[in-house]
Amino acid sequence: MFLRLFKYLWPERYLPETPAQDPFDENPPPCGPGRVGVLLVNLGTPDEPTRGAIRRYLGEFLSDPRVIEIPRYLWMPILHGLVLAMRPKKLAPRYAGIWMEEGSPLLVYSQRQAAGVRQGLAARGVHAEVELAMRYGKPSIPAAITALRERGCDHILAVPLYPQYAASTTATVVDAVTRHAGRLRDQPALRFVKRFHNDPAYVEAQAGRIAEFWQAHGRPQKLVMSFHGLPRYSIELGDPYYRDCLDTARLLRERLGLREDEVEVTFQSRFGSARWLEPYTEPTLAELARQGVTEVDVVCPGFVADCLETLEEISQECRDAFVAAGGRQFRYIPALNDCPPWIEGLTDLVERQLRGWPTGNP
């Protein structure tokens, strides 16, 4: 308290001795073309596949009240007393099994997406700085915003890389970006992409990914579209996620020319004991095998970059469940990652959202 009062009474003591720019300069240098920033944001990942790194990541992730919507006084003892004591040990070998030479697949592919958008915008004459951030872990949202501000960006477009909107994903990115920007004295103008589940650029890229896979490997008896699950109460409270998932699935089915009975829409990654969106992916795959379906392909349209949930949960655990129940051929169709049609589509989406801002475009 006394320190704050001291700073208030003698603020000059805490100012830089030689400010980078005189704030009272009547003729400040003109701002360069990098006045617009694009912030791509994905979920996050541990820094390395070790128990300690996973514990730090889960601690931040599962402490978010948007993710775990139960009273803090009930949840925090469970988180620190049970979850963080047990889950890292179980998850460490699973992360190690998918780790790439460059690092976590989610981070590697997200970095490539950011680089692709940066190059794509520049090729179109759009002057914008592009940074990648993770909602949990590194690179952090505050660090990315700071980097954009240091390059003169006073307009920032935040793009949560979640096609379907959910409060536990998209909204918490909005929370984090506005919270950090709100602490700045010179705040940037902000825009957010709420969702792109039905955006033609996204749908075309995702459908093209599936069609390209089939052209190389042939079509299966059944296509399973597996989306990340949510507790049912989230939908009952007004979250549009379930509707977004069904819209995406319908658009992809129509674009691929499939009948309704050739596609199954399921939900994965259930956590805890609450009832989640159904049908669940793994039991559905086992039931399909028991019904005589011997060939399935699984695609995860809610993930634009491969990660633990796709490379381990779907490609390995769900494969084992399908084969154990009598299935013969199980194939996972990779996420969009850094495939050129998706980089082009994401660049299109970003360019459209930047209209009206000083990007150098007419």
UniProtKB/Swiss-Prot annotation:
Molecular function via GO: ferrochelatase activity; metal ion binding
Species of origin: Bordetella bronchiseptica (strain ATCC BAA-588 / NCTC 13252 / RB50) (Alcaligenes bronchisepticus)
UniProt function note: Catalyzes the ferrous insertion into protoporphyrin IX.
Keywords: Cytoplasm, Heme biosynthesis, Iron, Lyase, Metal-binding, Porphyrin biosynthesis
Transmembrane segments: none
Root EC class: lyase
Residues involved in Fe cation binding: H228, E309
Localisation: Cytoplasm
Pathway named in the protein's UniProt entry: Porphyrin-containing compound metabolism; protoheme biosynthesis; protoheme from protoporphyrin-IX: step 1/1
Protein name, entry field: Ferrochelatase
EC number: 4.98.1.1
Keyword Metal-binding: yes
